[in-house]
Regions:
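Contiguous alpha-helical scaffold segments within structured protein domains
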Residues: 4-92
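Conserved hydrophobic core element of enzyme catalytic domains
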Residues: 56-163
Length: 163
């Protein structure tokens, strides 16, 4: 059987958000790795939601380790924006709360230097019999605040069902 990855019909805004992140990661990796490979964007299901995913891989040179690579990439536009320095300064000035566990990376780290990492976009912290859900939404010039809010609520339902 031939398995094909398909990008289901996604709104243009969602595809642009994915491309911002892909372009950023590829441009950063191209400065420190060789043979960067990028898949076509495709759709994956997580809980009840569909997401756009792009696989990106490369081989680190002798002078680059995983810690340096993460420092180079984090935060990605998925959680900060572009251009990164301007977006980060805006967030620091206007957001008004500690993002705590909202973002970071997670995945497999192994001694064979073949790691498989993901940007953490949603998570939950349970502390003192309280659950705190962390999620966000992609804000672009084409964003509709009502739709973004509904998207965040829908994203939270996946974790809320666990509780």
């Amino acid at each position: 059987l031939e398995f094909r990855r398909v990008l289901f019909r996604s709104p243009q805004k969602e595809q642009e958000e994915q491309q911002f992140v892909t372009d950023y990661i590829v441009s950063k990796l191209n400065t420190v790795t060789t043979a960067v490979q990028v898949s076509a964007a495709y759709s994956v299901k997580a809980g009840s939601l569909w997401h756009i995913k792009t696989d990106i891989s490369g081989a680190f040179g002798a002078k680059l380790n995983l810690k340096k690579a993460i420092q180079l990439l984090h935060p990605t536009p998925a959680v900060c924006g572009v251009p990164k320095e301007i977006a980060k300064a805006f967030i620091d000035t206007h957001e008004g709360y500690d993002r705590s566990f909202y973002t970071g990376f997670l995945g497999e780290l192994n001694r064979d230097f073949a790691s498989d990492l993901f940007v953490n976009l949603r998570c939950m912290q349970i502390e003192n019999n309280q659950a705190h859900l962390y999620m966000g939404c992609g804000i672009t010039k084409d964003s509709d605040s009502e739709k973004e809010w509904k998207e965040s609520v829908n994203k939270s339902m996946i974790m809320k069902r666990i509780l």
